[in-house]
Amino acid sequence: MIRVLSPFPDWLDLGGRTARPTQSDADILRARQQMVSEQLQVSARGITDPQVLKAMEKVPRHEFTPENVRAEAYDDTALSIGHGQTISQPFIVAFMTAQLQPQPEDRVLEIGTGSGYQAAVLAELVREVCTIEIVNPLAERARADLQRLGYNNVRVLSGDGH
């Protein structure tokens, strides 16, 4: 089955608590776990799919952010990744992923790779992800980051997904 992931309305309430990691691996891991427990699982936000929560906890969001905003990587906010683009806030990524209801045998097409973070989350849940980014430098950086992090089931294409 092929599923297409698309954005949702910008009117959704995106308020939430934040967790600022330091540079130590242990602190970053704690910040990622806190992101899941405090921003995504709280009843008002309603992310309940255990597989989605596990994927969000596993994927190192800080590895998909520029160095100058890395300390904010686990805040529930969009962050600039250059070229006028942003990495979506964690709640948005979790919400879209949960709405997709991914299955292990799925092949997913993502239009708008950005940093590659959403593709990495999806890659934890499905057989294959093909993602297309129109901004070539972002596609190249996402491809390199995904490969470096071992996401071999993600194919990054540079081009217009329209």
Regions found by a protein language model. Name each.
Residues 101-162:
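Conserved nucleotide-cofactor-binding alpha/beta core module
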Residues 2-109, 125, 140, 148, ...:
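Class I SAM-dependent transferase core
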